[in-house]
Amino acid sequence: MYNAGNYDVIVIGAGHAGCEAALAAAKLGCRTLMLTISLESIAMMPCNPSIGGPAKGHLVREIDALGGIMGLNIDRSRIQIRRLNSGKGPAVRALRAQADKKLYQREMTLTLERQEHLDVKQAEVIRILTESGRVKGVLTRTGAYFACRAIVLTTGTYLRGRIIIGEVAYAGGPNGQFPAIELAASLKELGLRMGRFKTGTPPRVSGRSINWDKMTEQPGDPGPLRFSFWEEGPERPNVSCWLTHTNTTTHNIIKDNLHRAPLFSGLIEGKGPRYCPSIEDKVVRFADKPGHQIFLEPEGMGTEEWYVQGLSTSLPEDVQLAVLHSVPGLEQAEMMRPGYAIEYDYIDPTQLKASLECKHIAGLFTAGQINGTSGYEEAAAQGLVAGINAARLVREQEPLILRRDQAYIGVLIDDLVTRGVTEPYRLLTSRAEHRLLLREDNADLRLGRIGYEIGLLDEQRFRKLEAKEKAINDGLVYLGKQHVGGNNPKIQEIIVACGEPPLKGTTSLKDLMRRPRIKYQDLAAAGLVPELPPEIAAEIEMMVKYEGYIAKEKIQVERLAKLEARVLPADLNYSEIRGLSRESIDHLERVKPRSLGQALRIPGVTPADISVLLVYLEQKKREGAKACAG
């Protein structure tokens, strides 16, 4: 072993969590080191070549608002972008972009290599070194010792990674990478509770062998859509995806080979993701369905490789090929890579604080799939928070903890540290109680100021945010002050043209816009309101139309805030509190909630338990007051 250097923060892993963590820590002025098994695997997309979607797109926008990199990077490397759920309510509308995988990696690698205060090195970490319950450094396979004050673990699916294809299983990481065997053992030695999950990926096929005429084209949306609030980004191509379906023949091939499927033969032990099941799992679970959607997605502009979305599998290679050839358009498909399942270790996230720091190992933060989540976006969001808080720990500042009513990032982390995981966790809009407040469109308004205050968002971007806030507020004030009457034929013409009943009497433009079919652009076209940039006009319109619903959600948030404000001591011995059941005590001791609000969200803890805790806190408060008076 030799002393290889001294850093403030060391980030282990260079996936989507690691990239955000390393950049955040370095931007906040910490001397930061990123260590990865392979420099070629930085920001790798081993599964789907896309970023975004419902809840996931919200996360990307929030990362961007706080000063993270994912939104900017996908804008620079996307080859298609679409707005999903555009016909639904604003809470669930979301962007989704297809990425040029290699370009995404190149752009991210360059960003990391050029970042001040950040060193990027290729090395396999085999041990986390601690002293007196605090991290002190890491040891690599080649004997290098790097000292540090904080570590961010972002190991993805590498911990004791095991690749499974049919009857074949071997140690490995994603896309032919090496697994991290000794590091997993080191974490167990540190006393971390660990579990085993699995995920999978579909085969890739050559575009030259696909019969596109048998598929339905899925083009991207026109217009200036982007994830980042701060940069418009370069002009990017718009490459179509393609839709086809499995059929009875496909399903029969799978059913005839279930005895060879590791998912059913017992070869796979880890629990897989509920919301991204393999094709063999879908065929068994949804036996009555005649077919399942299959999307062909481009992997990039510089390759003929296509991703077969919806056909994730760990069936033997020969069965995978037969399955592919049964799908319309893929009869002659050349399989470039087989699908596979990968098993990996994760840690129980209830061992973490809301800052993503381990409760019993000071300075050790974890982010991404090691915490039991799935998805690039979930990983990146955790990485950003872990990187920020590692830097804040080094600088002796309070951690950044986002509330559930502030951000989807807050929902994600609170779910992990409070409820834990029994399967790979995927963020959904339905997991957020206040999703109308947490829209994709207002992420900058919600979080941009926080990003600026902690030091990630620069002055130029903050000034842009302030200008946007002012334009929105001015627009709302103008709409409230300006009144129109039903005796104005021009007004009536606009109203009728929009399909709304004629106006009777006088009303404000704000009340007029509350009508479902009347849009800001209709009033602007008639010269009744000033022309505004589309994103500002859309924000004003949304705030007007949903004002009542938003007000109700804010009242609910205020009610819950009272429970969040009642802090529970970290050293509270729940077994000493009379009235709590044994089950509740076990749950409370495992999670050690920071507040009554968090305690209420722990599975197995009832409202009656909260009442007991409330009485206990009041009793302790009175005893404390008496002691002071005496």
UniProtKB/Swiss-Prot annotation:
Its cofactor is FAD. GO terms for cellular component: cytosol. One of its GO terms (molecular function) is flavin adenine dinucleotide binding. SUPFAM superfamilies: FAD/NAD(P)-binding domain. Pfam families: GIDA (PF01134), GIDA_C_1st (PF21680), SAM_GIDA_C (PF13932). It is found in: Cytoplasm. Keywords: Cytoplasm, FAD, Flavoprotein, NAD, tRNA processing. GO terms for biological process: tRNA methylation; tRNA wobble uridine modification. NAD(+) binds at residues 272-286. InterPro entries: FAD/NAD-bd_sf, GIDA_C_N, MnmG, MnmG-rel, MnmG-rel_CS, MnmG_C, MnmG_C_subdom, MnmG_C_subdom_sf. FAD binds at residues 13-18. Its main location: cytoplasm. Homodimer. Heterotetramer of two MnmE and two MnmG subunits. NAD-binding protein involved in the addition of a carboxymethylaminomethyl (cmnm) group at the wobble position (U34) of certain tRNAs, forming tRNA-cmnm(5)s(2)U34. Belongs to the MnmG family. HAMAP family: MnmG_GidA. This is tRNA uridine 5-carboxymethylaminomethyl modification enzyme MnmG. The lineage of its organism: Bacteria, Bacillati, Bacillota, Clostridia, Moorellales. The gene is mnmG.
